[in-house]
Amino acid sequence: MKGKCNIAKVLCLVLTFSVSLVCLADTALSAEPVNLTVGYQPYDTISYSAAVINARELWKKNLPPGSKVTFEGALQGSIIVNAMVADKQQIGYLGDMPAVVSTTKTRIAPIKLVANTGLSAGQRCNVIMVRSDAPDFKTPEEAVKWLNGKTFATPKGSCADRFLRTFVEKTGVKPKEVLNQSLEVIATNFRVHKIDAAVLWEPTVSRIGELVGEGVAKIAATGYTFNTPDAGFIAMRADFVEKHPDIAKAWLKTELDAQQFILDPNNWKEVAEIVKGQTTGISPAMAWFSIFGAVPDNCGGAPERDTKPFIFTPEVHDLITGTYIFLHSVKVIDVDKAPEGAIDDTLARQVVAEANAPTPLGVIIPKDVSQSPF
């Protein structure tokens, strides 16, 4: 009789423990509905996962039933940073420079970087383009010589701005002037030959370039040539994470699903069509090439187009640390390291562990343009 009682107690404990696990796993789904506003850049490959989440409504799987998510598109990250600081957006998809800058607004609104959306060898945002009638350079180093004394343009405060500053410092190139121009103005000025060069990011590079685009500019070099990687991040307001850790984690579960979707070659055509549907002027062929196409070797192409670490690996940490130091040295920010608690992938690591997913999640090996499905 006593043995039966002990068995009953054990079974009761096991059942209680199992129910507890189910309850913990289902915390977000059992919570009250939420209204989220997400800032993303459909004109940037670091936000393609957000575009997938938006199009396929993946967030419905993890957020409480009845929740609503509003996606607000922006042409560059600084716009998203301003919206997050003003508490108009809780979540933002950012390139490396605006991501780092966002964390320095501690007196107004502390912002955390909570996950990585992509890490490339300078293939995404660190791209130097030259006007269409520039010489056909045999190597990026040859292009560097031509670029000295030329007129550059880039959107100030962007990840491309960071690379241009780094490029000038590393090569000693002295631009005639550096113009602060939007993506559209740069494209227009390339058409009428008002600028010699620009530093831009994908998919605008593919849109105006000679490989699948309009042909008003040519890729001359990338960050791969100068050992300067680029990355994308998910930023969240610190007060949002503190008040709603379950919702923040639920969003990262959704992000994991989206990144895994992008990594599957069977989905590449659909990803391109999704991006086309959330942009203007970007064709499916341009969207496909911007993340899955191979940049030629002679202008800085790398063996890997993009890596999806998701968490902050040593390589991601190195990029973050270097970005703080560099932006402080050129007086863009007033600190040379991350504020306490600003770089926090705790929830991302939990999500990866619970999904039993590898880190990195995967790598995109680019295909030649001739293999495009479009």
Regions found by a protein language model. Give the residues of each.
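Short, glycine-/small- and polar/acidic-enriched structural segments
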Residues: 29-182, 189, 196-202, 218-222, ...
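Pocket-lining segment of extracytoplasmic ligand-binding domains
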Residues: 161, 176-179, 183-284
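Basic/polar N-terminal segments that are highly enriched at the extreme N-terminus
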Residues: 1-2, 25-30
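Bacterial N-terminal signal peptides
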Residues: 11-23
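Charged, glycine/proline-rich intrinsically disordered loops and linkers
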Residues: 133-144, 292-308, 362-373
